[in-house]
Each structure stands twice: as structure tokens, then as C-alpha cells.
Amino acid sequence: TNIQITNSWIGVNNWLIDHVLPETKWDISIDPELDLNMQGRYLMSCNHQSWVDTTVTQYFGLTRMPLTRFFTKWELIFIPFVGQAFKILGFPMMKRHSKEQIAQNPALKYQDMDEARKACEHLLSQPFTLLNYLEGTRFTAEKKAKQQSPFQNLLKPKAGGLALALNILGQQIDAFVDMTIVYPDGVPGYGEFWLGEVPRIVVDMRKINIPDWVIGGDYEDDAEYREKFQQWVDD
């Protein structure tokens, strides 16, 4: 199947990481409450610093979790090979209208929500890991300063996508997983990683309990729920 082919490709990458590149020390810590398996259904959040992060999640997850997918923009389907791969592998692809378009036609917002719901529900026919980079973009000191983020090593989280996924999938997932990736010797570029210039990578995995009030809320239209959800994510 397409997923087996993809996992074989990831397996080759992992073999290269383990046997060809200069040794990288992996320090992986997993919450005892996390019972990860290849048949599970997981929603996962992760900090985002480098393109290497995706390779790290693949390296970690190959024998522990189903193939990691993430929300992608529908427009990417028109990029040769990349877009087709996302589609074939069942990545949830979303059409999003601009704020200007929604202002002219508010019904488009609910059309976008319906598209997202269908994309998430499509995942439920199989084991999955759905990854959400809460920051929405890679962390840099410049972006942190511009945002005036209160967090030392994180940008302000964009919680809307997580709220949507939890409300659609929350009662049917086996765990909500928080992954933290740390590069103690400095954040590497993708080329640096494949040149073996990353001495150590730290990965911490923990289970996040989902409060009952989270499921069934309306992040878009309920200001009280939105504020409470944002505070939960910040904490």
C-alpha cells in the first residue's frame, strides 16, 4: 500500500541516520501513561523550530505510532509530486477562504469548518497520528520579539486548529500527545542534520488529559469558550 511504501522510505532514512551519519545521541523520554502502538489514533502537538522537526517525528514514530500526518493547504495539491503524495497518503487537505472573502460572505466560514470536519473524519477509517504545530510557524528569536511572546522558547500558540481537531476527533482518539523537541547544541538546518552535525536530540513525550468541557465547544463563535481554551493551551 501507499502507507507501506512511505514507511519503507522513512525506514531507509532512519537506517541512514543510525548507520551512515556520524552518531547522533537520541535522548527520548516517554510518559509511562502513554501506551503507544501502531493501531492507535493519536492527536499530537509539537513545538516547531526547524525543518528537522518533521524528520525527528518520523524517526521516533516509525515503529511506535501510525504514519504522522498534518493539515495541509488544498493549494499544495497543484505542486508536482508533493501535492499528489499528500493526497494519496490521506493528509487532511483544507480549503481556506481569506478574511476578506468571509467578510463579504460569512457563510464561507462554515463551509471551511465543514471541509475541516470532513478531512478529520476521513482519518477515522484507519489508525492515524495527526500532528499540529501549535505555533503555526517555526520559532525564531525575531518572531518571538515581534509577537512579544510570554514564553521563553515558544511563539504564541494558535489554538483554533487544535480546538477544531479536538472537537471533531476528541472522543475517538486514544491519546492527546504532547511532543517537545530540543536541540541542546543549537537549532540545526536540514542540511546540517544530514551532514551529521547534530550531536544530540532530546525528545520528550507526555500524555495530555483532555478536560470534559473541551469537547463540544464552539471556538469560533463562543468568546468565553475561546478564552478558556486558549488559557488551557497556554498552561
Regions found by a protein language model. Give the residues of each.
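Short, glycine/acidic-rich beta->alpha junctions
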Residues: 49-53, 111-115, 156-160
